[in-house]
UniProtKB/Swiss-Prot annotation:
Key words, A-Z: Coiled coil
Annotated Basic and acidic residues bias: 29-50, 95-106, 118-156, 313-324
InterPro entries for this protein: ICR
Biological source species: Arabidopsis thaliana
Quaternary structure and interacting proteins, as annotated: Interacts with ARAC11 in vitro.
Protein name: Interactor of constitutive active ROPs 4
Region (Disordered) location: 1-74, 91-156, 175-201, 289-324
């Protein structure tokens, strides 16, 4: 009869090794479950404000900083994804441990102790002893159930904490992904702007080179025109000197012509006076010299000599003016 009592006293002390191992594996590192996210990922708390774009003339230093910022964000994103994966694994383990604990508790509840029926021939003391054994078994079962409930509640709390952290990490990952995409877009935009700026710079350099060539051609043309202008100035000075000479010669010719005209006009007057004298003499000596051929010849010879002497004088004056 003491044999079943001993078996009954050992019954509540048995525990599933799988449950104990799972509980130890999930609760062996409480600091790992309760420490904040920033301890495991110190870079997640950094300032994630996107840098302002620099415009069409972006400095290469700012582009380098933008590239380093993107690489830093990518490393943070990878770290956050790794922590998210670890938390998911922990959550799966905790839920599995919770499920195993619930199954064990359900199995304990459904499993009733096989109590032997008291025999009629037993003595009254043995019945009292069996009643004590059942009470002890009941108390131990209640304690075991309470322990299981406490463990389940603890697992529930741990699962809730893990879910909250999982949610925070998911939000952090989404934020980092969005910022990473934004920075990548900014980097692409900066690259495009730099390409456009480089193309414009090349175009301006080509225009400057073309303008330089045109300027050289213009300088050469200016030098040629300057030489032509100098030659024209020299020709002009030469022509002006010749014009002055011609003007002086013309003035001399005019004076000579005036002198010749004066001489000619003086000879005409003298010829007129002589003809008047001759006419008066003819009137005076009309009866005596009429029809005399000698007088007619003398008058003709005198006027011809005067004319030839006037022409000779004009020629001499003309030669003298020309020599001057």
């Amino acid at each position: 009869m003491p044999k079943p009592s001993i078996r009954g006293s050992e019954l509540p002390q048995r525990q599933s090794p799988r449950l104990r191992t799972s509980l130890l594996s999930t609760s062996s590192d409480p600091h790992h479950l309760s420490r904040p996210i920033t301890d495991r990922s110190p870079k997640l708390g950094l300032d994630r404000r996107s840098p302002r774009s620099g415009g069409p003339h972006t400095d290469p230093l700012s582009q380098k900083k933008l590239g380093s910022r993107i690489s830093g964000l990518e490393s943070q994103l990878g770290q956050a994804q790794e922590e998210l994966r670890l938390l998911k694994q922990q959550l799966a383990k905790a839920e599995a441990a919770k499920k195993r604990a619930q199954e064990e508790l359900h199995r304990k509840k459904s499993k009733k102790p096989n109590t032997p029926a008291p025999e009629r021939d037993d003595i009254p003391g043995d019945g009292h002893q069996e009643t004590d054994v059942f009470e002890v078994l009941d108390e131990k079962a209640k304690e075991s159930e309470k322990t299981k409930n406490d463990e389940l509640a603890s697992k529930e709390d741990q699962i809730n904490v893990l879910k909250a952290r999982l949610y925070d990490l998911e939000k952090e990952r989404v934020s980092l992904s969005e910022e990473n995409e934004t920075l990548k877009d900014q980097l692409k935009k900066t690259d495009t702007e730099m390409s456009c700026a480089k193309a414009k710079e090349d175009e301006i350099a080509s225009k400057v080179s073309q303008i330089g060539e045109e300027l050289e051609e213009s300088n050469e043309t200016t030098a040629k025109l300057k030489k032509k202008l100098e030659s024209v100035e020299e020709a002009k000075e030469t022509l002006e000197a010749e014009m002055k000479k011609l003007k002086v010669q013309t003035e001399q010719w005019r004076k000579a012509a005036d002198a010749a005209a004066a001489v000619l006009s003086g000879g005409v007057e003298m010829n007129g006076r002589f003809s008047e004298q001759c006419g008066s003499m003819e009137k005076h000596f009309a009866g005596r010299f009429v029809g005399s051929p000698g007088m007619a010849d003398d008058s003709d010879d005198g006027s011809g000599k005067r004319k030839s002497s006037g022409k000779k004088m004009f020629g001499d004056l003309w030669k003298k003016k020309g020599q001057k």
